[in-house]
Amino acid sequence: MGLEAQRLPGAEEAPVRVALRVRPLLPKELLHGHQSCLQVEPGLGRVTLGRDRHFGFHVVLAEDAGQEAVYQACVQPLLEAFFEGFNATVFAYGQTGSGKTYTMGEASVASLLEDEQGIVPRAMAEAFKLIDENDLLDCLVHVSYLEVYKEEFRDLLEVGTASRDIQLREDERGNVVLCGVKEVDVEGLDEVLSLLEMGNAARHTGATHLNHLSSRSHTVFTVTLEQRGRAPSRLPRPAPGQLLVSKFHFVDLAGSERVLKTGSTGERLKESIQINSSLLALGNVISALGDPQRRGSHIPYRDSKITRILKDSLGGNAKTVMIACVSPSSSDFDETLNTLNYASRAQNIRNRATVNWRPEAERPPEETASGARGPPRHRSETRIIHRGRRAPGPATASAAAAMRLGAECARYRACTDAAYSLLRELQAEPGLPGAAARKVRDWLCAVEGERSALSSASGPDSGIESASVEDQAAQGAGGRKEDEGAQQLLTLQNQVARLEEENRDFLAALEDAMEQYKLQSDRLREQQEEMVELRLRLELVRPGWGGPRLLNGLPPGSFVPRPHTAPLGGAHAHVLGMVPPACLPGDEVGSEQRGEQVTNGREAGAELLTEVNRLGSGSSAASEEEEEEEEPPRRTLHLRRNRISNCSQRAGARPGSLPERKGPELCLEELDAAIPGSRAVGGSKARVQARQVPPATASEWRLAQAQQKIRELAINIRMKEELIGELVRTGKAAQALNRQHSQRIRELEQEAEQVRAELSEGQRQLRELEGKELQDAGERSRLQEFRRRVAAAQSQVQVLKEKKQATERLVSLSAQSEKRLQELERNVQLMRQQQGQLQRRLREETEQKRRLEAEMSKRQHRVKELELKHEQQQKILKIKTEEIAAFQRKRRSGSNGSVVSLEQQQKIEEQKKWLDQEMEKVLQQRRALEELGEELHKREAILAKKEALMQEKTGLESKRLRSSQALNEDIVRVSSRLEHLEKELSEKSGQLRQGSAQSQQQIRGEIDSLRQEKDSLLKQRLEIDGKLRQGSLLSPEEERTLFQLDEAIEALDAAIEYKNEAITCRQRVLRASASLLSQCEMNLMAKLSYLSSSETRALLCKYFDKVVTLREEQHQQQIAFSELEMQLEEQQRLVYWLEVALERQRLEMDRQLTLQQKEHEQNMQLLLQQSRDHLGEGLADSRRQYEARIQALEKELGRYMWINQELKQKLGGVNAVGHSRGGEKRSLCSEGRQAPGNEDELHLAPELLWLSPLTEGAPRTREETRDLVHAPLPLTWKRSSLCGEEQGSPEELRQREAAEPLVGRVLPVGEAGLPWNFGPLSKPRRELRRASPGMIDVRKNPL
């Protein structure tokens, strides 16, 4: 919509094509017995509403039409026109809950099965497939996603965009233009589906009474295709400088709503008002365009924003298809009629469709940059839906075949090029075996032979190593051009013929494989349908046919929801047991097929149900064994989602719960089949087909899930590898920059040291100047100049420190890049491991699927045998049903023919009361028996608990006994030891009396040690005696436990005694009541035998009506329970879809993060390059500064030489004056000695003249100033006076030696006033003349 198309004069009239799609009845509608009010005739394109309202449309799709049929009938022609340059629009119209969003495919974006994919995913997959097949096309595809909510625009791809920033305008050609909407360039189906899911997450949805996930806004998904370059023959060829631009709009309108039905309040009510007003405006536009009498009148496009967006689609420049979705339920009769009326009017709308061209110059520069980037990745990585293509027409068959062959040739040549390069590398390997090397050499020779044969055929379709453009021009020159062209044509025709032959072989093999696969799939589907039908009949046999089995009979595909509007940072959803929508047998929006209502006896299906459930449990067990090999959390979630374990449990529980019956006995439960009105509340014609999840379907779903996961991981791995490459390049750039920065850091450190030295010297001089008393204004000005320069030096030091810190931060980038590179490599390795696991799992699933198919073929024989048995049982059941019907007719005739008197009625009522009392006695007897059984169970539990406590107590008592025995043993041991010590003490005492003094000392020590040991043993014996007297043989915790056990056992004994008394009492009462019941039963039979036939029939009718009432109440409860289970199933499905959306968002977040990191690395590379360039510029600037400084020094040197020359001339003049004063040398010398000051002044004056400008020049470094001040005068200055006379004059030498100390004394005085840093001196132009080396040499050596 943001593109401007130029309309050509030759416009094609294209009427709006209308397709009608009828959705199946919803499970809730089937549950409440809603009737279908539509009769569909798809072959005639006609539908009848009610009895006498007939409508005809271009396409009519019945309830059993799949998504593929909708796409082929409605969208496939539009896609072809889209590639031919026409604008196309497809929009869904209908009431809320009629299946519009499901048809468009926005609700099933995350679905893994092909049958659930809607229009948008299929169209985008087909578009990218066509682009991939046509390599000669240069295409650019970009998409946008817009929402109209409460008459305000919202960009679903850029949620932060304000509504006021999106404006709808018209250009000078009348085209509708949307400004401010984000358009994203896409290269594959995965990107489109990711954008759709992202937009659906931001779309407004909500719950109403009619639809739990109702669209609360209109959405427009726009795909723009730009084609340039050479186009295939079946497509228009763009003119030079022209661009073929076409737009495809997928519009999902919100459904019309009735407030009373939807129960909308508050915000939902406001949304409903806005939706109905915009749909009313759209209906007015359709009515105005579709009414032949109103042609040329005003069309109210501006009444709503959605009508302004659809201006080109309705009556404008586009080919449009309208899909009207209706509900067949009789409760939606009025809404269905309204939709059919509008759809019928829309067939009269005529559009003027043209091919849209745009000048190439109008292409925005950003698109040019994006189009000039590298070749895009192949779209085969995306989730392209594999399906059969429609057979092309005879007019385009040859062109399409030629196009396909050209694409095949290009692909074969590319593969040959790659194989040639790889085999050349392989041939260079030393370890290649001889046979393999020979085969490789033969293949390379064959390829080179073909290359030499086709060496003249260069261009985009040539063979390996085709000639360049210059070679083509050289080969095509002269008279050989026609011969070579003919030879090339012949060679290419032969090659095309060979490739066609190979292609035909491949296609034949592919068709055989596809045919075999279709046969196997059809056979498997038939087997599954037969099993499902048998399950249906078995479920309908049982009396309690509602409730869970009814819910299982409703195809869960009807609950497929759209992704719900949810906060982006919501909590994690709870994992509930549910069936994933991908493995459900539902076809489309609430696709449930109606089964026949069969009346069977319970004994007729018990054996069949047992066998079928046994088979189902076997497959479930096999699936469970395979899943047990995985991790426990994943296995648990998988089993919950597929409900394999639940099916197995039900299969094992049902056969045991069925009582065995030997004969076809008639019971009250079987009378339900003949009771009118006992099946449903709203009607007796509700038909439900019970369907179970076949193991093969679950296996296919797991296969598709694993394949999708592998594809997504492959894309993430590729993106991570690209990011790793960017990180490697960034690391190399950072290393190069680190080397430069290291050098720069060293230079900055040297410069900083120099600046610090200058700063310290300047501060020192400044302190010296401040310490002295300033005499004049010049010194004060110099002091201020020093202070200013010190401050400048300090700021320069600070700047250098900051530069050093910034440089160090840049140096640390390399280490960070290395760390991130290692982390990304670990992530890629982990992803590869996951990919390997998924591939192994994929192989296992494939093997399991093969085993299941083999097992299904074996089960088929058993199913046929069961069918024969079932037919026999059906005959028996039919006989019983006829008997029941005859009995009812007889009962009705008897009740109508007899007149019951009032006394008989009272008697019947008394008998009924008496029977009710007897029934109550029986019920009381049963309740008493149940209570007795409960008491017995409780007593058993108490006895078991007492047994456990007794065992624990026995253990503690045995432990106490063992402790007591151990203590007794300790006492015996201690006593024996004491006796032994007593004997030793008596012996030692005798030795002590008889021994010597030395031995007595030793014996006393031994006696002391023995007495100490005796005392300790006595204490130990006392402690043991105390324990035995106190009975503390166990630890305090064990003693407390033993005490508690005694108390608990005592309490249990009391409880057991009480239970025994209660049981005895109940048994006594039951024995008495049993005798009474036996007597009552005899009396009951006697009284019933005395009743007349009319009284018996009347009494039976009373009880029959009571049973019917009870059955009605039970059925109402079952319906309520089924509704609750359906709500639970919907919530579980919502949780599943949210989990899928969350997983997709995680992958998308990972991809976006990878892209951002890649962009960041590219920005870092640019920053490093700029930093490197800036650093080079800085080095160049410093080099230029040094060169300028050298030039300034050379200029100063020239100036000093000029001053030197002037001083020589003055000195020569002074010497000449001295010679002319007299001829006596002694007097001249004495005068020179007497008046040295004048001569010094004459000698020093010019020197002071050239020293004074130094104080006024630009600042210099302290070292330069010190060198200039303290450097000795050049030797040429000392020799300059000898140019005109003898050099050995001692008088003149003494004069010069006398003058030199004066110069030494004068210079230090000026040193204090000299600045510590000099700059270039300002001199006249004539002084800037640089002296040549020859002149300098002449001046130094004048002789």
From Swiss-Prot:
Q: Which CDD domains match?
A: KISc_KIF4 (cd01372)
Give the multimer and partner information. Can form homodimers and interacts with microtubules. Interacts with GLI1, GLI2, GLI3, SMO and SUFU. Interacts with NPHP1. Interacts with SMO and DLG5 (via PDZ4 or guanylate kinase-like domain).
Gene label: KIF7
Entry coiled-coil feature ranges: 480-542, 698-1057, 1109-1211
Q: Which Gene3D superfamilies does this chain map to?
A: Kinesin motor domain
Q: Where is this region: Sufficient for interaction with NPHP1?
A: 513-775
Q: Name one Pfam family in it.
A: Kinesin
Location in the cell reads: Cell projection, Cilium; Cytoplasm, Cytoskeleton, Cilium basal body
Protein name per the record: Kinesin-like protein KIF7
From the UniProt entry, list the residue stretches annotated as the region Interaction with SMO: 358-1206
